[in-house]
């Protein structure tokens, strides 16, 4: 097998690997965002019903909602990179010659990668003690589900949890930053392979303006037969 064929085979293997992992990551992100958004909405609604109809409340509703919102935001940051939802400035890329756009894009994604890796390291260092020497540290109000009591044997020396241990909701930090780092690696690979020349894939204002122009054009075409009929 020639060197060219070997390089081509390695390229397709890398592309296939990124594609499979990317699809799996898509499923995780979409499931977590949908689950926590739905659960947060239902919990808030149930708490309102309890308060106004039964003069009672769900004690752990506020704390649970805060943790679910944190999960949704941290996972949503990764999902936003995938869908190009984040705000970016591409003035330099637009005025740069085509041969330099890839370089500018690689510099931008390298800065984002450095930032996300620092966040990943910091979030891991913050979360890790809560699953080791601080595994006993529980949340204030959220009860521990019976189906998760097996974790007590794994990390809490068999001592049963009454409330949800903090390492479970705090896991949003390393998981969210790991997903974010992977998304930046994915963007970097797309830039290297020529699929993208920038991290920003769309411009919301320009897209809205184009849509408005199209609507005005259609409205003008619809009015033309009526105007011509009146002239006759």
Curated annotation (Swiss-Prot):
InterPro entries assigned to the protein according to its UniProt record, in alphabetical order = DctQ, TRAP_DctQ
Q: Which UniProt keywords apply?
A: Cell inner membrane, Cell membrane, Membrane, Transmembrane, Transmembrane helix, Transport
Q: Where in the cell is it found?
A: Cell inner membrane
Pfam entry (one): DctQ
According to UniProt, the name of this protein is: C4-dicarboxylate TRAP transporter small permease protein DctQ
TM region(s), chain numbering: 30-50, 58-78, 103-123, 167-187
Q: What does this protein do?
A: Part of the tripartite ATP-independent periplasmic (TRAP) transport system DctPQM involved in C4-dicarboxylates uptake.
The membrane topology term of the UniProt record is: Multi-pass membrane protein
The coding gene here is dctQ
User: What processes in GO biological process is this protein linked to?
Assistant: C4-dicarboxylate transport
Relate the assembly described in the record: The complex comprises the extracytoplasmic solute receptor protein DctP, and the two transmembrane proteins DctQ and DctM.
Lineage at the top is: Bacteria, Pseudomonadati, Pseudomonadota, Gammaproteobacteria, Vibrionales
The organism's superkingdom is given as Bacteria
Q: Which family does it belong to?
A: Belongs to the TRAP transporter small permease family.
Could you name the Gene Ontology cellular component terms for this entry?
plasma membrane
Naturally occurring in which organism (per UniProt):
Vibrio cholerae serotype O1 (strain ATCC 39315 / El Tor Inaba N16961)
| One function term, GO molecular function aspect | transmembrane transporter activity
**Location, primary (coarse class):** membrane
